[in-house]
Amino acid sequence: MSFIRIARSLARGYYNLPTNIIDRTSINTSRKDDDSDTKATGSQLDSPDEEWLKDYNSFVNVRRRNRSVLRTFVFGIGLFLIIAILTLWWPLTGADLPQCHSIYMYPSYARVDGFNEKFTSLANKYHLYLYREQGMDKEPLNNGEIQLDGIPVLFIPGNAGSYRQVRSIAAACSELYFKQSDILINKNAKNLDFFAADFNEDFTAFHGGTMLDQAEYLNDAIRYILSLYDQPDVSTTLAKPKSVIIVAHSMGGIVARLMPTLKNHIHGSVHSYLTLSSPHAAAPITFDGDVLQLYKRTNEYWKRELNDKSSFIFNNVSLISITGGIQDTILPADYAMIEDLIPYSNGFTVHTNTIQDVWTPIDHLAIVWCKQLREIISRYLVETSNIYLPSKVVPLEERMKIASQLFLSGFEDSYRNYSGEELRNLTTNSEVSSEMKLNDIVKITKDTIPDKPYLSVPVAQFDGNVFLTLFSNSDNIKILGCANSYRHDPTIHSCKDLSHFIKKVPRYFDPNKEHKTESNKLLHTSIDEFKKYDFVIVDFSTIVEEHDLLVYATLSREEHTVIDVTPSNLLFMSQKIKVPPGALMNKWEFINLWDSLFAYKMNVDTTAMEQPFEPFVKQHIKEPFETKWHLNVLESTTSISFHNIAPFIPTNENITRSLFLTLVGSPENDYFIRISVDYLMTLKLLYIRYRLAIASFPIAVITMVLAYQFYIYDRRGIFLPFVTALGHLISTYNTIICFSLLGLSFLCDMKLVQNALFAIDPSHLNKPYFNSNKDVRNNFYLLGLRSKLLGVLVYFFFTIGTALVILLNGILLTFQKLFTMAINLKRTNMLQNQRTNTTAIITKWRFLALFLIIISVSTFIPYQMAFMLAVIIQVINSLKVSSLSARTKNHQNLLNFNMSLLLLLIFIAIIDFPIIIVFLHNVAIRCGTSFRSQHNCLAIIPILLMVNNNSLLRLPNRTKGNKGRLVSLLGLIYLSLFSLIYGIRNLFWLHHGVNIFSMWVFYLTIFSKGS
């Protein structure tokens, strides 16, 4: 029976039911009307006010409201758990599976002790290392002196990253130059001297001051590195380097772009940037306003420089941004985009799925060591080096050409127009050459190798919509562009090798095997690409007879079909496509499938009993460069996801945003394709993009409920329990809330509304259009949605936020109830007596402690640390009120008020906690970092005054007249709307909003006379 009584007691505590909680000796009857002042003290034990008790019960004792809360809780927590389970345990398949190979190296690191306080003020906090691959690179030190003989490269680690992450790429560069130099095309290449910054695993993403420190240190480091090559003992007589190559991971890429904006930057000291999983497009977290300010400053600087055709950056600097795609669960791959900022003449974004011989997504940490990718990166770094130039890299145009050749799939429009190498004179006649006609299909196997080794395509006979398509599993096929150079003999041609148009594509692989390393060859090129030639010749002369040899060649008009289907069409029914025989490649453009929040599933079937080769599907979008190769499509359902138009990412509205799918299959067979929405994958993708909503939406819910609590309190003198007030709002206004959120989603996607929201944004950091380019726009508001169909997500996340608040409130009330039950009932009046006798002493010591905290914030600790102290004080306040309520049952209003405030402060503490991590990290390594903006006393004094005042067991006075009530109501509603509309991209400002609210509460408690 005792267990049942405890359970019943806990349940009453959770729902704040009136039964046996409020008796007639616990009601303050000093009020003579509904607008009387409310002030709870330990000595108020008068007889009850019958009308007040009736009003209280009319709000609290409504089971329907409790059922509404329970339904909302179950629905919200259910959604939250589904997304969490899918994120953590739902497996990725097919092209989204990681396929990185293992690696090994023999690293050594030499700390550059010469880079000390004489060269940088941050030498005590950060350090510089020189990497050497054992057995290949020079020994790092000789008699204590650094030995340098290559081209300087600086590696910048990311958030909490280590300088040791340089080893994989640096080792690959050394191995390429010293052991595989015969494959290098660039004869002016040189080995690379890799330097790496040691930031003591600083949390760069959390703190703008840390970003500034790192950028300042790196500028000093570059100055020092370049000075090392000016020393006479450096073994080179060539041009001294005037710049370094930068390779950066994660937030290191943002620090690298920040460097040129600082005063200590050496003009022209960096020509080449290569970033790995760096969030260029948007800050991954928004807990610190300084980070957002630095993003804005950096982007404006780069945009201004790139708009100036005479600037150094426009004419010399390249930036390649590589992202791991869907496997990166730390940073949304959308955030790595630079297309809105940097023109294609200076850089581009590419997904690792796209890169030839990589063809795999890569997670956030593996991107610095994945074997396939590091081999391509090392090739790029070495091939773009030039020992004879002071910049130590080839000119910008050549650098971008090499980047396109190495990092793109080869099927992009920007890849075209590279001239082939002069080959030889070639003699063709009817005995050795056959002419290919429109709609011809040529098939070659080991049993049908043609007697005529040349297949000729007369270019002049066809228009630009005719495509030459070639599929082969052989490496011994060439494409030649030939012209009739000898008028006396039309069978003799001058030819160039155009085999670079033939690209690798991943071969069908067994998912049970560890690796897939083999590739097929694919050519799909418009005849327009060959207009300067008379003939295009497919050369089979060197083909080798193999048991699985297969070659298909077709000449046909491109099968490009535009499909006008929307995600809403695919929600409940699938799009079916029939592919008749006759074409080697069939291409579809889905002009309305552009939203990255949707994922789709595709099934491919065929009536053919046998397949000459396994058909596969190429999926791609035009910006950024993202190509996926879906293999094994006949065996299983294929998941389709992409990174196109995404929340909070700038988008050029003049660029085609269609999703393209291309089926490569036997022209002898027919195929059937079915596409529909993949609900589970769509839910899985929500987490990575909306993690910050877990912090902002609950605050919107809490402040909305607080507004209602204050409204009822001002009118009737009842400060409702939090769950009771929430239940009343849900049961009464749920439909209004739902449609209001949907309407808000539609409004926030309108350009006029976005401009208005930016005008009234107190932070003024997120401009909906990018500088003067009105075609590049962004939606920073609410969930950043561009699709009206997904407006329902706002209500879903609001429900999840509500459920999380209910959960935390239940946990707090449970602990409060357990604490109350644990109190010794014999000491009923001890606390009241102690408070009566020592009030003056406690107040004196509290204000002394408050003064010391303010001094500490001004000089040493960030205000976020003081806020954590305020949260602890509020916890104590709530427990103290709980203990008094448990004995005298006369502080229900005071308990409800303190518990609601505690809920709000706990969620704000989640936002402030990362800055505290940075501060404690710096204390642990005994290094100081500037916390300039965090030493703002005004950002914490009102909160400290409020919680200190709460510790004296005071309630705010009920406001006099409508004006005071309006201030409380509108202030909290504004804070709730701000949390919804601006919160995700301005989490740092929510602290300041609560700080202003705290000042108002303090004013109501101390200075307001009430009514």
UniProtKB/Swiss-Prot annotation:
Record has Cell inner membrane as a keyword: no
Membrane-topology descriptor: Multi-pass membrane protein
Main location: endoplasmic reticulum
GO-annotated cellular components: endoplasmic reticulum membrane
Keyword Transmembrane helix: yes
Any one GO molecular-function label of the UniProt entry: phosphatidylinositol deacylase activity
Glycosylation sites: 28, 66, 316, 417, 425, 654, 837, 898, 949, 957
EC number per UniProt: 3.1.-.-
InterPro entries, per the entry: AB_hydrolase_fold (IPR029058), PGAP1-ab_dom-like (IPR012908), PGAP1/BST1 (IPR039529), PGAP1_TMD (IPR056824)
Region (Disordered): 28-47
The protein's name: GPI inositol-deacylase
Keywords annotated in UniProt: Endoplasmic reticulum, Glycoprotein, Hydrolase, Membrane, Protein transport, Transmembrane, Transmembrane helix, Transport
Active site: 250
Chain's role: Involved in inositol deacylation of GPI-anchored proteins which plays important roles in the quality control and ER-associated degradation of GPI-anchored proteins.
Top-level class of the enzyme under EC nomenclature: hydrolase
UniProt record similarity statement: Belongs to the GPI inositol-deacylase family.
Gene Ontology biological-process annotations: endoplasmic reticulum to Golgi vesicle-mediated transport; ERAD pathway; GPI anchor metabolic process; protein retention in ER lumen; protein transport; protein-lipid complex remodeling; vesicle organization
Native species: Candida glabrata (strain ATCC 2001 / BCRC 20586 / JCM 3761 / NBRC 0622 / NRRL Y-65 / CBS 138)
Alphabetized PANTHER family for the sequence: GPI INOSITOL-DEACYLASE, NEGATIVE REGULATOR OF VESICLE FORMATION-RELATED
Compartment list: Endoplasmic reticulum membrane
Transmembrane portions of the chain: 72-92, 692-712, 717-737, 740-760, 792-812, 847-867, 900-920, 964-984, 987-1007
Classification lineage: Eukaryota, Fungi, Dikarya, Ascomycota, Saccharomycotina
